[in-house]
Amino acid sequence: MVNDLDRGRFPKAWFGEWAPDPPVFDWATELLNVAIRDQPDAAWDLILILVERAPHDDALGWVGAGPLEDLLCEHGPIFIERAEVIANGDERFRKCLSRVWGSNRMEPGVYERMCQAAPGPRGERP
């Protein structure tokens, strides 16, 4: 699904789509949305690339509140242990994970584990 060329240009394109207010979604957002639905392991890899290459804390928030939240809501039991392990040793990932809300869409056990792995101000979005 994602070749080396995409891995190189994907983060730049994705952050470029999410930077405007409101965001202007294009191929990178769509690619990740499809991956979350159909190829969650590929989506996980792309999310980790985004966390690594996020240019600032706001961008980490976009990743957390967007694709990471969607992945954990749709496939949380598969990915929560991976998220816990990475959050334990990676401050950037932990900060990104702290931006995930999703309590009304996520399995309660997954949500509790996520909150323990990355405490942060959470609530329901208006």
Where are these regions (language model features)?
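Alpha-helical solenoid scaffolds in large eukaryotic transport, assembly, and signaling factors
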Residues: 2-115
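Low-complexity intrinsically disordered segments
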Residues: 118-126
